[in-house]
């Protein structure tokens, strides 16, 4: 649904892992200035811009601008980002409410609850009762004021906890078990209003805490954030599994900082880019502080993503590696519908001593046609040979192969 369903998505940079809650207008503009020079197309302001939110202890439900952080207001920030030629996106967690919020003080009964039982805090927040129209109307009204106040072109809709004490203050006892269903219908209702009233806005669902990457969400949002675990090696299994049910174009995937903030692992910038290319592609880091070598490689990384994005979005996807069986390597392939080209990607997770070069068989090619790898146009190989004899993934001793842990390689095959 929506105009982005079949379109290439903007290459965004999200400030979450760059700043967490510690940001202001000047910091976001600094990130945007550097990002715009590198070819990044959108700045997304994540959690911490509303209420009086300096940590996860407050303000969910108070969807008005935190003036202490955004001096000059939201429109000023968005206008400054737009002047750089970039789009602007914003984070909401519309289903949640903090005990320390104006909304909870005014309407404590709006939280999902079972009468007589204490409410369970998770990430210092409760869940709003979306079975109630007055709750949805209030949240939508606050979101609408924000969206109408500036040129916002993307929403990240987050959900950072599961449901507990699943009951409603308005339902009779014999109908309390309906709340699970009524709640989801309420979420759909609000998303429907958003996507109807703002069809130009790209809606990305995000549910690291609620584990809600599902077809219902995909109807309203053409992309969903896979996981807050952004480590490239962790993402191999995450994205492999997600792609079994959902198109790669729906998988939110970013190049993040190193050491990775979740697992502490260092991986090459190139590998992080190759893994993120399988999904929507973007950046989750502070471009003003990363090593110069990494910063300098971003324009070429973006160029590579743009070159192959249509093939990734519309081609046939083949999972060639078996990370769940042999966690030393992974590989995948995208083949154009007309079999005119194929993109093969390989990640060496762990280097091993005295191991033979791997021979990997491609899939989905035209058996009787001939193909050449983009960097070797004079070397033509039949599709049958590529699929039955395979290709040799060179090892480090020949001078041009893969060296060490966490390295990657892509090969682009073109039909003659």
Place the predicted regions along the sequence by residue.
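Aromatic-lined carbohydrate-binding/catalytic grooves of carbohydrate-active enzymes
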Residues: 4-144, 154
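Catalytic cores of secreted or luminal carbohydrate-active enzymes
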Residues: 270-321
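Flexible loop/turn segments at secondary-structure boundaries
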Residues: 19-22, 50-56, 95-101, 161-166, ...
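Glycan-recognition surfaces
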Residues: 103-137, 181-288
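Short acidic/histidine-rich active-site segments
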Residues: 47, 153-165, 199, 204-213
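C-terminal beta-sandwich/jelly-roll accessory domains of carbohydrate-active enzymes
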Residues: 350-416
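Carbohydrate-binding surface patches
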Residues: 324-366
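Conserved, mostly hydrophobic/aromatic
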Residues: 13, 43, 81, 139, ...
């Amino acid at each position: 649904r929506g105009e982005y369903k079949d379109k290439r998505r903007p290459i965004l940079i999200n400030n979450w892992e760059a700043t967490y809650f510690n940001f202001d207008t000047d910091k976001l503009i600094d990130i945007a200035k550097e990002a715009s020079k590198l070819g990044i197309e959108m700045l997304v302001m994540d959690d911490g811009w509303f209420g009086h939110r300096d940590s996860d202890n407050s303000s969910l439900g108070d969807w008005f601008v935190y003036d202490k952080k955004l001096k000059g207001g939201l429109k000023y920030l968005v206008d400054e980002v737009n002047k750089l030629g970039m789009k602007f996106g914003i984070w909401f967690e519309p289903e949640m409410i903090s005990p320390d919020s104006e909304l909870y003080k005014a309407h404590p009964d709006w939280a999902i609850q079972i009468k007589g039982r204490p409410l369970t805090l998770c990430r210092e927040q409760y869940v709003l009762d979306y079975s109630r129209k007055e709750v949805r109307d209030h949240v939508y009204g606050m979101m609408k004021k924000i969206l109408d106040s500036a040129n916002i072109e993307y929403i990240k809709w987050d959900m950072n906890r599961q449901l507990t004490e699943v009951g409603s203050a308005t339902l009779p006892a014999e109908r309390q078990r309906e709340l699970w269903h009524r709640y989801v219908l309420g979420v759909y209702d609000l998303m429907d209003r958003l996507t109807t009233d703002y069809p130009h806005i790209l809606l990305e669902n995000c549910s690291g805490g609620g584990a809600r990457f599902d077809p219902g969400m995909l109807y309203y949002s053409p992309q969903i954030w896979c996981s807050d675990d952004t480590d490239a090696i962790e993402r191999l299994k995450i994205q492999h599994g997600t792609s079994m049910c959902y198109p790669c174009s729906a998988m939110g995937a970013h190049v993040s900082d190193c050491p990775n903030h979740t697992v502490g692992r260092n991986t090459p910038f190139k590998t992080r880019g190759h893994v993120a290319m399988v999904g929507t592609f973007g950046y989750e880091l502070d471009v003003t502080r990363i090593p110069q070598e990494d910063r300098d490689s971003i324009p070429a990384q973006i160029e590579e993503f743009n070159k192959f994005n249509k093939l990734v979005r519309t081609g046939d996807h083949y999972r060639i590696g078996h990370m769940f069986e042999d966690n030393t390597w992974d590989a995948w392939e995208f083949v154009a519908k007309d079999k005119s080209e194929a993109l093969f990607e390989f990640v060496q997770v762990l280097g091993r001593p005295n191991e033979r070069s791997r021979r990997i068989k491609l899939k989905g090619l035209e058996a009787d046609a001939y193909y050449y790898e983009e960097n070797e146009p004079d070397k033509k190989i039949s599709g049958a040979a590529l699929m039955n004899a395979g290709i040799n993934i060179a090892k480090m001793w020949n001078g041009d192969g893969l060296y060490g842990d966490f390295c990657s390689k892509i090969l682009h095959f073109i039909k003659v």
